[in-house]
């Protein structure tokens, strides 16, 4: 059984036991979050596609940690003027483990 969920503006194909890095969620570590934006769900009964979401379907996940991702370097310059700027950015993310997929 797998599901396609939407969180943080991105879509993920998940199964029970999967560990994902998603955009930062407002939840404490070791808490359980309920994701109800399920776009599609596949099981032994068949494949169900939502319009846009499947009614009554949800995915439960356990929050494992909050951390920052690798640093991304942004370098901007303008030719012939000597102007340049170097910036770094580290995006926050949440690591979750899928515990339950319900229809």
Curated annotation (Swiss-Prot):
SUPFAM superfamilies: L21p-like (SSF141091). GO terms for cellular component: cytoplasm; ribonucleoprotein complex; ribosome. GO terms for biological process: translation. GO terms for molecular function: rRNA binding; structural constituent of ribosome. Keywords: Ribonucleoprotein, Ribosomal protein, RNA-binding, rRNA-binding. Part of the 50S ribosomal subunit. Contacts protein L20. NCBIfam families: L21. Belongs to the bacterial ribosomal protein bL21 family. This is Large ribosomal subunit protein bL21.
């Amino acid at each position: 059984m797998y599901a396609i969920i939407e969180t943080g503006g991105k879509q993920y194909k998940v199964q029970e036991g999967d560990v994902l890095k998603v955009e930062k969620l407002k939840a404490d570590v070791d808490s359980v979050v309920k994701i109800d934006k399920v776009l599609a769900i596949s099981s032994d009964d068949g494949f169900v596609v939502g319009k846009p979401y499947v009614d009554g379907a949800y995915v439960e996940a356990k929050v494992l940690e909050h951390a920052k991702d690798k640093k991304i370097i942004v370098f901007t310059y303008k030719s012939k003027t000597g102007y340049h700027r170097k910036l770094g950015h580290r995006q926050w993310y949440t690591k979750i483990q899928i515990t339950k997929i319900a229809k």
